[in-house]
Amino acid sequence: MTKTLSCGAVIYRKIQGRILFLILKHTNGNHWSLAKGHTEFGESEIQTAVREIDEETGLRVKFKPGFREAIRYSPSPGVEKTVVFFLAKARGKKLTLQRSEISNGIWVELEDSLKLISHKDTAEVLRRAQAYLIQE
């Protein structure tokens, strides 16, 4: 069994009491998800998340301590993929999308993001992020 690890983040911002999440439309598979990507040799999970967020969105973020969610699935026979998501507040709103991988990026509230997110495990990570932010 081949194991792969990707890392990324639930990126959010707060506007007038509303929590908005950034969801991205990935060109590979044409699906909506979060900023994430494969770890490179020697990188920590957080380092991978920072690099992927920068590459895919151009955003600088501040990570919220204490939030780490992992999902596991098999994208193909003989492959087990783990994706680790952190929670990160955007320091700005201007997106510079990596057009080779990302065709669109939008800021939406939880309900709208759940209608677009393609994988139910990722939708559950968004729900947990919202609950975490509300508890603050």
Language-model-detected regions and their locations in the chain:
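Short helix-loop capping/hinge motifs at secondary-structure junctions, enriched
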Residues: 17-18, 93-96
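Conserved N-terminal beta-strand and adjoining loop/helix that marks the start
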Residues: 1-20
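NUDIX/MutT-family hydrolases
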Residues: 96-129
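Conserved Nudix-box catalytic region and its N-terminal flanking loop in Nudix hydrolases
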Residues: 18-60
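Active-site segment of metal-dependent pyrophosphate-handling enzymes
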Residues: 58-94
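Short polar/acidic secondary-structure junctions
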Residues: 14-16, 26, 76
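Short, well-ordered beta-strand micro-motif
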Residues: 11, 23, 87-89
